From Swiss-Prot:
Localization annotation: Cytoplasm
Biological classification of the source: Bacteria, Pseudomonadati, Pseudomonadota, Alphaproteobacteria, Rickettsiales
GO annotations of cellular component type: cytoplasm
Protein's UniProt keywords contain Ligase: yes
Keyword check for ATP-binding: yes
Entry EC number(s): 6.1.1.21
Name recorded for this polypeptide: Histidine--tRNA ligase
UniProt keyword annotations, A-Z: Aminoacyl-tRNA synthetase, ATP-binding, Cytoplasm, Ligase, Nucleotide-binding, Protein biosynthesis
An example Gene Ontology molecular-function term: histidine-tRNA ligase activity
SUPFAM superfamilies given in the database record: Class II aaRS ABD-related, Class II aaRS and biotin synthetases
Main location, first listed in the record: cytoplasm
């Protein structure tokens, strides 16, 4: 194999040791909190039929630009999942799950984007979906779940909740007319993407990060001016619920989310510490998605959190167990070391023994200089059923009877 192929594919990253422990800590914490809220863990394949994701919307960047599509050997159109929600909806429908139901999932997703800090082509998400409730209380519960995760990661004071309400269909229809009327005056000044969206999905322009678009949007009509009474009441209940939980928020009427299936409540938890990739958790309602994919009409709300972005923010150091290294001296001691290592590991002791053909005791001790405890034994120790236990931090060394070794080590590693 060519040397230049022995590297990570652009937009992907190997995870080793401490960084992987950070990921696992976040995922484990999320699953623990999910369980408190009554979520069931599920796992879906990373490949799905392409049609599963086309319901994301033909105007979304994910569908038009970012999906990894290919034909398998049977000629089927297959896609590496770019997000979880559509795959979870597919699972809900195909398994005929009883609603209401809350589903938790996590794992890698894939998007063909320009790689940059905290934005890779393969990245990891924790994902929460709640199917079967059209109550604003469900929205409050899901947002509070996000806040719960951030609080336990000690990030709640460094992240801002931005929330918007897209309204009911009557609200959206009325708002689109006035928004398009306003934007048509500046059509030639809009970015290329926004000129295209003006025709197919004008609401997506509100989410533009283009400087020229942002300037134009400053004086654009606000969707809140077109809320029906039902929309006003629903949004008020959501905000009252957040106030009741003392969860601070900022209303941002430009949040529409990047996927076409969102409706009513949409939200993002953002930070100023990650540059342009400022969204850490994002989600909202998608009451029409299940029906559009062939299921029954099912109200739903969900969100996803980027593990890489959370990992970049948290202050976490994996507490590694104390390492115990074996240094057998001689062939008989080496044979005994195999048995000793196995027995200690079965009792929960972390034993490191990689050098099966040791050199001198001096060299082996030098190699073990950065470890915690060393067990030394040769012919003399085998005959007396003892082991030399050396604390590499203090230099203390003592002979310990084999029958007392486990208790001795457990006392040292606590």
């Amino acid at each position: 194999m060519q040397h230049n192929k022995l590297r990570e594919v652009r937009g992907t990253k190997d995870l080793l040791d401490d960084e992987l422990y950070r990921f696992q800590y976040i995922q484990h914490l999320a699953q623990t909190i999910a369980s408190r809220y009554g979520f069931i863990p599920v796992d879906t394949p990373i490949i799905e039929f392409t049609e599963v994701f086309t319901k994301l919307g033909n105007t979304s960047d994910i569908v038009t630009k970012e999906m990894y599509n290919f034909k398998d050997k049977a000629g089927e159109d297959i896609t590496l999942r770019p997000e979880f929600t559509s795959a979870i909806v597919r699972l809900l429908i195909s398994k005929n799950l009883t609603i209401p139901v809350k589903l938790f999932s996590s794992g890698p997703v894939f998007r063909y984007e320009r790689p940059q800090k905290c934005r890779q082509r393969q990245f990891h998400q924790i994902n929460f979906e709640f199917f079967g409730s059209d109550s604003p209380i469900a929205d409050v519960e899901m947002i509070s779940l996000c806040y719960n995760i951030l609080s336990e990661l000690k990030l709640s004071d460094r992240i801002k909740l931005e929330i918007n309400f897209l309204g009911d269909q009557e609200t959206i229809n009325s708002y689109k007319i006035h928004l398009v009327e306003y934007l048509n005056k500046y059509q030639k000044d809009l970015s290329e993407d926004s000129q295209r969206r003006l025709v197919v999905n004008p609401l997506r322009i509100l989410d533009s990060k283009s400087p020229e678009d942002c300037k134009i949007l400053l004086n654009a009509p606000s969707i809140s001016d077109f809320y029906t009474q039902n929309s006003q009441n629903f949004f008020k209940e959501v905000l009252d619920g957040l106030d009741n939980l003392s969860i601070n928020y900022v209303i941002n009427h430009n949040i529409v989310r990047g996927l076409d299936y969102y409706c009513k409540t949409v939200f993002e938890f953002t930070t100023s510490e990650l540059g342009s990739q400022n969204s850490v958790i994002a989600g909202g309602r998608y009451d029409g998605l299940v029906k559009s994919m062939g299921g029954h009409s099912t109200p739903a709300i969900g969100f996803a959190a980027g593990v890489e972005r959370l990992s970049a923010l948290i202050d976490y150091e994996h507490k590694k167990p104390k390492r115990i290294v074996l240094i057998p001296i001689g062939d008989d001691a080496t044979s005994y070391a195999i048995k000793l290592a196995y027995e200690l590991r079965c009792k929960g002791i972390h034993v490191c023994w990689n050098n099966y053909r040791g050199t001198s005791l001096k060299n082996e001790l030098r190699k073990a200089n950065d470890t915690d405890i060393v067990l030394i034994f040769g012919d003399e120790e085998l005959q007396s059923n003892t082991v030399k236990v050396k604390d590499m931090k203090t230099g203390d060394q003592q002979n310990v009877a084999v029958c007392d070794l486990l208790d001795n080590l457990l006392h040292r590693i606590v």
